[in-house]
C-alpha cells in the first residue's frame, strides 16, 4: 500500500524522464535519413496509435461537442496535437493541484483492519499535506436548447467517398442513481441486443450507410448519461 500511495501522491518524475515518457525531438533511426528529426515520446506515440482509428476520432469529436469546455470534452490520454505543448513545469503544477488528498476519496473493501489502514494513510500521505482551498469537481454540462450540428474531419482510410461517419446523440440526466443506470441499460438491451432488435435492425437494413456505428450505445459511465446512434460508410 505504501508503494501505491507514494507513487500517487509523491511521484519521482524528473525532467529527463518527462522527455522520454512525454515528448521529445529525436533522430530517425534508419540508414536513409540519419539527419532527419522527428517527434517521439512513449505517451505521444501511444496516443498517436490510440487516436489513429476513425472510431476513436469520432468518439473524441462527439465528447468535445456534447461536453464543450468540460472535463469530459478533453482527451484523458492527451491529444497528440496538444501533447508537444505540455511543459514539465505545467505537469508538476497539474499534479500538485489535482493529486491532493483534499481531492481524494479513500475506499476500503474486505475484511481488513480499518484503523490500521487509516493510520498507514495518515502516516504516508495525510500528515504531509495541509487542506487545500481548491474546489475541484465535475460539473454538469449545460443542456441543449436546440439541436447542435458539428463536423469533424479525419484522414480517410481510402479514397472511397462513402467513408463518412454520422452520429446522433442525446445528452441526458445524471447517472448517480443505480436504478436509473439499470433502466438505461435495459432500454439499450431492448433496442440493440441483437440484429432483431428494432434499432439495430433499422440501422443494418438502411441504405443510408454500410454498417451501424460501433459507438451506437447508451453511455452510463460518465456523470451524465448520453445515448448515441449512428452509421459508418455514409456517402457524401
Can you say where each PLM-predicted feature lies in the sequence?
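Charge-rich, well-structured scaffold segments of protease-associated domains
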Residues: 1-146, 152-183, 189-199, 205-236
Amino acid at each position: 500500500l505504501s508503494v501505491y500511495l507514494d507513487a500517487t501522491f509523491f511521484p519521482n518524475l524528473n525532467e529527463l524522464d518527462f522527455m522520454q515518457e512525454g515528448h521529445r525531438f529525436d533522430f530517425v533511426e534508419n540508414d536513409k535519413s540519419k539527419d532527419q528529426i522527428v517527434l517521439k515520446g512513449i505517451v505521444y506515440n501511444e496516443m498517436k496509435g490510440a487516436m489513429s482509428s476513425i472510431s476513436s476520432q469520432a468518439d473524441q469529436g462527439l465528447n468535445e461537442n456534447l461536453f464543450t469546455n468540460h472535463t469530459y470534452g478533453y482527451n484523458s490520454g492527451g491529444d497528440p496535437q496538444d501533447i508537444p505543448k505540455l511543459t514539465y513545469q505545467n505537469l508538476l503544477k497539474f499534479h500538485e493541484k489535482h493529486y491532493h488528498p483534499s481531492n481524494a476519496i479513500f475506499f476500503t473493501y474486505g475484511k481488513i483492519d480499518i484503523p490500521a489502514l487509516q493510520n498507514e494513510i495518515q502516516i504516508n500521505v495525510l500528515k504531509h499535506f495541509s487542506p487545500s482551498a481548491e474546489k475541484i469537481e465535475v460539473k454538469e454540462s449545460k443542456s441543449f436548447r436546440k439541436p447542435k450540428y458539428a463536423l469533424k474531419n479525419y484522414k480517410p482510410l481510402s479514397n472511397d467517398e462513402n467513408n463518412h461517419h454520422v452520429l446522433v446523440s442525446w445528452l441526458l440526466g445524471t447517472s448517480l442513481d443505480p436504478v436509473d443506470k439499470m433502466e438505461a441499460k435495459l432500454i439499450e438491451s431492448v433496442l440493440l441486443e441483437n440484429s432483431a432488435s428494432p434499432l439495430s435492425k433499422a440501422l443494418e437494413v438502411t441504405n443510408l450507410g454500410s454498417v451501424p456505428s460501433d459507438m451506437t450505445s447508451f453511455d452510463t459511465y460518465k456523470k451524465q448519461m448520453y445515448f448515441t446512434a449512428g452509421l459508418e460508410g455514409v456517402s457524401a
